[in-house]
């Protein structure tokens, strides 16, 4: 049997789910499909932290509030942070960013991805939106003015407009032949949660080591500030060595690499190790097709901005589609969809380039580069206006914001 919709969203992760919610009152027949069961786990506040977290910006918080999702996150578990401290492990340069410098309450919230996902799914289940679970895409081709999708179980779906929100290894992007520019950082990231003897002080800490950045991101449980999510970017060989250590030895290595800023590392949860690659689609749209989130771009986890870019993608695309619908335009028209690409691609590319340059700068080892790097950090630390600009960018409140992200 063939199913039909006005718009198919492939991928019910955080970004795809947000887009579906943003379109819930559009009058369009929206169908959200995913290869997972799309079920919500009962939340256990005493359970260990999930290893994968996101640093949600103020813009993302506004979007999630307006979609009716933020309370579901706050009622589970989220950790606000007010400050960020960055320093160069090869010198004396350091810089401190504060929410107070721009009269904000917080810089953002560290939230487990599973918490965000479950809050979104809870909201989706409360809405009158079509959802198709355990739906794995196998084939996709043009059929007249529509896309015809075939699932692994043989079912077929038809729609004039398909949104790819199916992640970094997007099947939609592959099946429709959209090329990407991608490169391997030759680094792996070790992620886990650790408990320290000193409180994190609602501060995100980041040290640049000779092998890559090491971040301690604050987590909070029952008002206690002694847990952090860590993201340790290093060479593949060093990552392999660190992953082979027992928990006690790993904690001691982590403590040394972090210069004991948070005292003794008391314990560590199970570790994950993931290779770091950056991808960017050469185009975000085609006739009847748009890419959002990691399907369009993946960036270095250095700034924790990946999902924030994705939420802005979803909010802008929803805005473009709703405005086009009001004008009576054909939503699948590539000219309509290109409005989304024009608004999002330059911003995403600029942030990706900045993160790439920052990462390369701190990996450069020659003495003159290290001297300039430290001098630059010290200089910016003495320039409150420059630091405030960085903070506003981190809050996600600059550039061409969609209505969902505006105050």
Q: Model regions: which residues?
A:
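Conserved Rossmann-like nucleotide-cofactor binding loop
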Residues: 15, 38, 169
């Amino acid at each position: 049997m063939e199913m039909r919709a006005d718009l198919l969203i492939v991928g019910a992760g955080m970004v795809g789910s947000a887009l579906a919610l943003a379109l819930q009152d559009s009058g369009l027949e929206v169908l959200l499909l995913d290869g997972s069961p799309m079920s919500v786990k009962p939340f256990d506040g005493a359970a260990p932290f999930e290893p994968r977290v996101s640093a949600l910006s103020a813009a993302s918080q506004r979007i999630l509030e307006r979609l009716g999702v933020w309370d579901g996150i706050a009622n589970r578990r989220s950790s606000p942070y007010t400050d960020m401290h960055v320093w160069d492990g090869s010198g004396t340069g350091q810089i401190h960013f504060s929410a107070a410098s721009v009269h904000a309450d917080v810089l953002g919230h560290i939230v487990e991805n599973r918490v965000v996902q479950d809050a979104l799914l809870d909201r989706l289940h409360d809405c009158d939106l079509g959802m198709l679970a355990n739906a794995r895409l196998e084939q996709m081709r043009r059929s007249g003015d529509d896309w015809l999708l075939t699932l692994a179980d043989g079912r077929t779906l038809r729609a004039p407009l398909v949104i790819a929100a199916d992640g970094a290894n997007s099947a939609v992007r592959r099946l429709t032949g959209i090329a990407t520019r991608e490169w391997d950082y030759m680094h792996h990231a070790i992620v886990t949660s650790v408990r320290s003897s000193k409180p994190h002080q609602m501060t995100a800490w980041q040290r640049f080591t000779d092998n890559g950045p090491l971040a301690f991101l604050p987590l909070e449980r029952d008002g206690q500030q002694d847990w952090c999510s860590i993201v340790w970017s290093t060479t593949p060989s060093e990552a392999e060595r660190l992953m082979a250590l027992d928990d006690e030895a790993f904690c001691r290595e982590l403590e040394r690499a972090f210069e004991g800023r948070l005292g003794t590392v008391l314990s560590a949860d199970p570790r994950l190790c993931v290779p770091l690659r950056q991808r960017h689609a050469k185009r975000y749209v085609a006739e009847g097709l748009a890419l959002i989130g990691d399907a369009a771009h993946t960036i270095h986890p250095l700034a924790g901005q990946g999902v924030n870019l994705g939420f802005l993608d979803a909010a802008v695309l929803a805005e473009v589609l709703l405005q086009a619908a009001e004008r009576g335009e054909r939503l699948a028209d590539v000219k309509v969809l290109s409005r989304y690409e024009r608004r999002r691609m330059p911003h995403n590319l600029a942030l990706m380039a900045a993160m790439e340059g920052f990462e390369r700068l701190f990996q450069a080892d020659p003495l003159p580069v290290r001297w300039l790097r430290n001098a630059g950090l010290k200089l910016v630390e003495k320039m409150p206006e420059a630091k405030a600009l960085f903070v506003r960018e981190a809050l996600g409140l600059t550039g061409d914001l969609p209505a969902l992200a505006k105050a």
